[in-house]
């Protein structure tokens, strides 16, 4: 990445079988994230990678933070594939950038409203089933992840604050009707 300036978007620690497979492919790597790092695929804070899922990444957080990696939290896909529940609160507490994603391959909707709702719901399940010290996401936090959290990867977008770029799509409803 440093040579080409091209950024990487991929999956990281989505499910236990994927983690085991990467360990077979790169046995010298300490964990799945290290497999990316040894091949210089995480970039740096100026050219960070985006890694989707990051469900089993608690031992990878230092490496994610060091490289400025953005986490794309895809709650619907994680539910549909029974992958697990991402430790989003822990990412936020560690200062790791998080945005919401839809992962259309494993999800059924591109709706950020749906992703936002599911992010709150699965964070409650994480709190109840995995770590009762990890507070569930609030609506405001999930809204941030769906807007400015993910938008910050692209610069000053994702919010209506002064100094930010307008990055919305305006669709006229009459043009979307079937049969027209």
Where are these regions (language model features)?
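Active-site core of metal-dependent hydrolases
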Residues: 1-106
